[in-house]
Amino acid sequence: MNFENLLIELGTEELPPKALRKLAESFLANFTEELTKADLAFKSAVWYAAPRRLALNITELAIAQADKIVEKRGPAVSSAFDAGGKPTKAAEGWARGNGITVDQAERLVTDKGEWLVYNAKVEGVETKSLVAAMAQRALDKLPIPKPMRWGSSKTQFIRPVHTATMLLGSELIEGELLGIKSARNIRGHRFMGTGFELDHADNYLTLLKEKGKVIADYESRKALIKADAEKAAAKIGGTADIEDALLEEVTSLVEWPVVLTASFEEKFLSVPSEALVYTMKGDQKYFPVFDDAGKLLPNFIFVANIESKDPAQIISGNEKVVRPRLADAEFFFNTDKKHTLESRLPSLETVLFQQQLGTLKDKVTRISALAAFIAEQTGANAVDAARAGLLSKTDLMTNMVMEFTDTQGTMGMHYARLDGETEAVALAMEEQYKPKFSGDTVPTAAVSCAVALADKLDTLVGIFGIGQAPKGAADPFALRRAAIGVLRIIVENKLPLDLVTLIAKAQELHGANLSNANASEEVLEFLMARFRAWYQDKGINVDVILAVLARRPTRPADFDSRINAVSHFRGLEASSALAAANKRVSNILAKVEGELPSSVNVALLSEAAEQALAAKLAELQPQLAPLFANADYQQALTLLASLRESVDQFFEDVMVMADDAALRNNRLALLNNLREQFLHVADISLLQ
């Protein structure tokens, strides 16, 4: 079979930078799915993307589908011929429909009978006649929330489309994409490049770079920007802050990246660096530069989309653009310093947190009390926790945070230090919002943990308490993130906290605000569900999670210890046999009516196997008790794994449901005792 390389390019107006990668990846995934459905073999497939184009390159694509043999079954032989052996009308009609005579048909014999059959050869369709329709279907399935129309056309896409190119090797594939006829013309850089006609699919990247002044390979463009930015920073003795999200956005904004270095007045360094970095990265898409000590330098690196004969002019222009933003930050900072955070408390009364839950002033009052309560249980400074909780939202009323919203908490920390608050209070101002996103770190300082937990629990209990739990994908108060935050803070810091106690205290502090009588139970269930999702994301087997959840441990740190212990136990050789035995025990005990017998009478142990099991349990229990008390569940389950032989022998030799009631109840008590030892950790009968 012959192969050729396929090139598809869509020339557009500027595509949304934050959506560019997803659009290109989805286009590729959709198109390769079409190829697979069409039984078109190919070696590899890659996507290219730049601000004004999406492209695919499929290497060694079959130029046609493979020929197929299609079995066309006809009537049964018994009904295909009459008594004289002549073909019936049914047989002749079937043969005529397939373009053959009855004599040309073959016979198919199965265990159900014999049929006429025709193995028809179906020639494969040429790839060039399939590509346009497949590409259009791939484009139709792109994740575009708000498509637009342009000109007089009714065609819709994320941005207006001007060119479409489909080449199979050197052959132009006829057809249309989004109403644009396929042609060889490729547009270059808007200012630097020239348009050209593409002669062969293999020359796309090279000609586009040489003639069009466009680096279409997204990953190459990204790597070039990163390398050049790092070199530029090193030249001025610094290190560029190149966050991947910002690097992705910048890569999606330029076709021909030119990395340049600019500077700003050193006087602006008196402003907390986070505010300066926020405006450089968030507003201007610049890369800040830091020295070896992590101190911000009065420089930044930016990426131009053009090679200029006078780069100094471009640098000067960017410096002029950023200067007013930095001056604003300086003004806000100097103005905010004139007022303490404490003096801003009354202004929180003017901001509503939630209609039924009161103002931000009401919220910080609750946070303060709950943070102090948590601090007392964890050994943190309760006075600092209460103070940090009270001030926790005051920086929201500052000019700086109102203008640069992402600096909330961080600016609170700086202002708290200027106000003379303790370092624990200042740090808690910043860390209260952690973790902000998946993979973010959690606070580790004791006071910070107390305040972060108090804030999240106050929101969780409050919103559930007024009957506004998240439904479906909607989660306006980010309760799922808050719940994961609560669990992570407690688990990762190994805090001795009980969710039931925390929820009850938060509910108490809300007082009469809450109308949902089941709020505490619903919040606990919500947190438990987050536990399951969190551990699944970490790769823990679902049966392990369910085994622990069955015991309903409400101390997250304890829950985590059980998860780790059961995961370890699951890897032991004895685990599957003991899990099966526990399942058998549970089934037996579930059928017992009334109260289960609890004490074992050694004198009634008549069988050797039950005597051995009872003796083994009696031997282990003194060793297990301190392990359970100290939550050393892994060692406890390792000890319990030694019961395997005794348990197996018991079920092999002993009739549990004996006719003698005394014997039966004694054996049930023994099994109940066995199960209880495992239930100190988890219900291992749920392990698969």
Curated annotation (Swiss-Prot):
Any one GO MF annotation of this record: ATP binding
Top-level taxon of origin: Bacteria
Keyword entries, A-Z: Aminoacyl-tRNA synthetase, ATP-binding, Cytoplasm, Ligase, Nucleotide-binding, Protein biosynthesis
Swiss-Prot/TrEMBL catalytic activity: tRNA(Gly) + glycine + ATP = glycyl-tRNA(Gly) + AMP + diphosphate
Xref: SMART domains: DALR_1
InterPro entries per record: DALR_anticod-bd, Gly-tRNA-synth_bsu, Gly-tRNA-synth_heterodimer
Location in or out of the cell: Cytoplasm
An annotated GO BP: arginyl-tRNA aminoacylation
Signal peptide extent: none
GO cellular component, one term: cytosol
Keyword field contains Ligase: yes
This protein's record includes keyword Hydrolase: no
PROSITE patterns listed in its UniProt record: AA_TRNA_LIGASE_II_GLYAB
EC number: 6.1.1.14
Family statement: Belongs to the class-II aminoacyl-tRNA synthetase family.
PANTHER family recorded: GLYCINE--TRNA LIGASE, CHLOROPLASTIC_MITOCHONDRIAL 2, GLYCYL-TRNA SYNTHETASE
Record note on quaternary structure: Tetramer of two alpha and two beta subunits.
Protein name: Glycine--tRNA ligase beta subunit
Source species: Shewanella oneidensis (strain ATCC 700550 / JCM 31522 / CIP 106686 / LMG 19005 / NCIMB 14063 / MR-1)
